[in-house]
Amino acid sequence: MKKTLLALTLLCTAASLLHAEKLVIKGSDTIGAKLVPQLAEEYKAQHPDVSFEIAAEGSTTGITAIIDGTAQIGMASRPTKATEVSAAAAKGVTFKETIIAFDGIAVIVNGGNAVSSLTKKQIEQIFSGDVTDWSAVGGKPGPISIYTRNTSSGTYSEFKELAMSKRDYAGSSQKLAGNEQIAAEVGKNPNGIGYVGLAYLGASGVKAVGVDGAVPTSANVQAKKYPFARPLYYYTNGTPAGEAARFVEFTLSPTGQQTVSKVGFVAIK
């Protein structure tokens, strides 16, 4: 009897492993450092046979992973570029874009900085290197230290688009891999300035500045009052199937969108 039970247990375990699926999700740090791990944890509680591999290394890596077939879902904080669409088409890949949330790119300074608001023009001048001292924008004299995301980041390019009239960043700017790293550096540097997604505004030692009087809050993003707002995306190769489709549906469900809001982004519905 015991041998029979053991055999049945082994058979059930083997069957479970055969039906288990690993969902590979790559791309945006903005989405992948906090939101998707939380969604995955909640999804796995309902679907324990599903495992996740999540790599949050920048939007470009997520889009490239869809082109190369190394992920089922690509996370991105920017739309695909024409060059990426062409590269995908050459491999028979057609992007399916799904907006999963909205975000605001918040400009942050050290918590001890007296500056509480900047104009869009001042932000462009600071990040492009035209303005290099805080005294030029109402702060105490001191050289401005600029922290940006690296070039694989969707936020890197979106900030240039939304805040810098597509100009290049100052040569002195320091490129970092993620939102949390930028917040940490600005928090340590009294003269620091950088940008992060809404979900990262709780970092110690930093504060968000208003932009033309509008502060980066979920309410202002939702009301379209904050100028540096943008959608956040999942990309798949065509209409997703299987576990990928179910995870996308879960993200868009009331439960998933509640998690979007809880993490600090703006739900789409």
Which residue ranges define each predicted feature?
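Exported/periplasmic ABC-transporter solute-binding proteins
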Residues: 20-269
